[in-house]
Amino acid sequence: MKALYPDIITTVGIIFLIILELFLPSFDLIGFLGFLISFISGVLAIKYSLAGYRFNEWLLDINAFSLLLKGVMYILTSFVIFSSVSFFKSKKTFVENVYTFLLISLGLSIMVSSKNLAVILAGLELASISMYISVGMLRDDYISKEASFKYLVLGSMTTAFFGIGSAFYIGATSHLDIISVSVNHNTAFALASLFLFVAFALKVSAAPFHFWTPDAYEGAPTSNTAFISTVPKIGFYAVLFLLASYIFPVTNNFSYIVGIVGVISMFWGNLVAYAQNSAKRMLAYSSIGHAGYFLIGFSRYNPLSVSSTIFYVIVYAFATAGAFLVLSILEKNQSWTHDMSNYRALYKRSPFLATALALFLFALIGIPPFATFVGKLGIFLGLVNSNAWFFAILFVIGSIIAAGYYLKLIVYMFFKEPATKDNMSLSLNLFDTIGISAFLIIVFFFGIFPNILFDIILKDMFHG
């Protein structure tokens, strides 16, 4: 029963914050309590994961692996809330932003708590609806509202694909439990696999299902982009792991479809990123490229490949959230835009922010000593061990191509002269510094000591 405590605490906390906000609509108070609720839930989830707790009743199947993912999502949520409160206040966004983040995390937590398609859909819808709202949280901002509507329209296709896939799944198996797959390779089951995969490919921004991503990421408040581009990805890839574990192996050659979509996404995201003049849109296409890396990792179901992919997803989430949060700090200065020209000589105006953003970009490239390097190396070795040389070679080529557009922004920050002589001062408070430093420490720490996290993932995924 203790395995349910993190979700119970979050649920009660959300209800409390909704009531409290009616009487005390203070960003500082609601933000602090939101941070506390999410952080406590995350710590408890990781504690129970390490203790091997399990709950397997009422269509739920909470084990050590799902508890680990819950813990990571809740802690990452708490970090983003902590780092975003000053941005919320500067942009006069809605106080509801805080518990919208908690609602998304709760939906994702429900989603990874079950191997039943009905429960997964319930969690998916709670998270998705809250994400649509989160994108449109900027007051009196047409672009934000337009981005939210586009995300709603295209994101709703996920529900349609998921529902169709579930219908075919019931027709093929007569139940909704993913773990009870024992059917022949019939057409209905193959279609179920295809539609379920497309549903989550759309959610993780994999090409050619990525069209909502650039507009949603650019139109959302930047701190909200930091959240929706990272925390949900952990939950969605966890479900893709379940599909890769139980459904895809039963369908002949389906792993090749996953791998090919991954290759398309990797090259499309990384190549189109070069054409972007906005740092925010560039990072949006970076997420599309990374979706390709992750899908290629899942395309070969072996312990090293899939555990490396989950490890990579987790550390990528911290690196990407950190990068977007640096952008949100810059955006608090009212005249700031994310055009590349504004990043010229950023190092002279704010050495800390320029250095932090450069380190996050190096982490996204995937070079040592950052934790993302370990994830990429593990995926590559997993592909080699599976004799998937075609995907392994393309994986390396895609990673090399991606380095260029990250380095382009770094060159602008450190080696380009400003476009104007206007030496705009950039504000930076203590909470900004602490928040960004926390993300940097995590990305560095698990790069130097990867086994601490990697061994837990490997053990929980295949023995939890």
Swiss-Prot record:
NDH-1 is composed of 14 different subunits. Subunits NuoA, H, J, K, L, M, N constitute the membrane sector of the complex. It is a multi-pass membrane protein. The chain crosses the membrane at residues 12-32, 33-53, 62-82, 93-113, 117-137, 152-172, 189-209, 227-247, 254-274, 282-304, 310-330, 351-371, 400-420, 434-454. It comes from the Bacteria. Belongs to the complex I subunit 2 family. It is found in: Cell inner membrane. The keyword Cell membrane applies. The lineage of its organism: Bacteria, Pseudomonadati, Aquificota, Aquificia, Aquificales. One of its GO terms (cellular component) is plasma membrane. NDH-1 shuttles electrons from NADH, via FMN and iron-sulfur (Fe-S) centers, to quinones in the respiratory chain. The immediate electron acceptor for the enzyme in this species is believed to be ubiquinone. Couples the redox reaction to proton translocation (for every two electrons transferred, four hydrogen ions are translocated across the cytoplasmic membrane), and thus conserves the redox energy in a proton gradient. It catalyses: a quinone + NADH + 5 H(+)(in) = a quinol + NAD(+) + 4 H(+)(out). Coiled coil: none annotated. InterPro entries: NADH-Q_OxRdtase_suN/2, ND/Mrp_TM. GO terms for biological process: ATP synthesis coupled electron transport. Its EC number is 7.1.1.-. GO terms for molecular function: NADH dehydrogenase (ubiquinone) activity; NADH:ubiquinone reductase (non-electrogenic) activity; quinone binding. This is NADH-quinone oxidoreductase subunit N 2. Keywords: Cell inner membrane, Cell membrane, Membrane, NAD, Quinone, Translocase, Transmembrane, Transmembrane helix, Transport, Ubiquinone.
